[in-house]
């Protein structure tokens, strides 16, 4: 059986791993391709320590981002209802539709939180009334808010 060499990747490599991963490869692959191209470093105890420190920092950063998103979710749900005023025609039908940008602007106006409009999911809104919207604040955190569409 051939001997394998442990290397730490410095760049993402298809079918091998992503930057910072510890992988075992054939010695020739490491010596002839990965090391000369600067794609990997031989896994020494010092480099393994550095990789572990980077992973810990990244884990802490992701945890802080998630906690901040949870706090933003709580703030949005505390307010409860956001009012959007639209011009109304006959039978409570509004002119145009309520867009995600309008919802993001109302949220910013009421909470001073910048929300990306692409993270907002709205139902089809064509009349005045109350609607539920989903606001994705983080890949794992989604807040549900209530939108009231009212006449001008």
Curated annotation (Swiss-Prot):
Q: Does the keyword Membrane apply?
A: no
Q: Which GO terms describe its cellular component?
A: ribonucleoprotein complex; ribosome
Source domain of life is Bacteria
The reply on keyword S-adenosyl-L-methionine is no
Which residues fall in a coiled-coil region?
A: none
Q: Which GO terms describe its molecular function?
A: rRNA binding; structural constituent of ribosome
Q: Gene3D superfamilies recorded for this chain?
A: Ribosomal protein L9, C-terminal domain (3.10.430.100), Ribosomal protein L9, N-terminal domain (3.40.5.10)
**Keyword annotations of the record:** Ribonucleoprotein, Ribosomal protein, RNA-binding, rRNA-binding
Q: Which GO terms describe its biological process?
A: translation
- Sorted alphabetically, which NCBIfam families does this protein's record hold? L9 (TIGR00158)
Function field: Binds to the 23S rRNA.
By sequence similarity, the record places it as follows:
Belongs to the bacterial ribosomal protein bL9 family.
What is the name listed in the Swiss-Prot or TrEMBL entry for this protein?
Answer: Large ribosomal subunit protein bL9
The organism's taxonomic lineage, starting at the top: Bacteria, Bacillati, Cyanobacteriota, Cyanophyceae, Oscillatoriophycideae
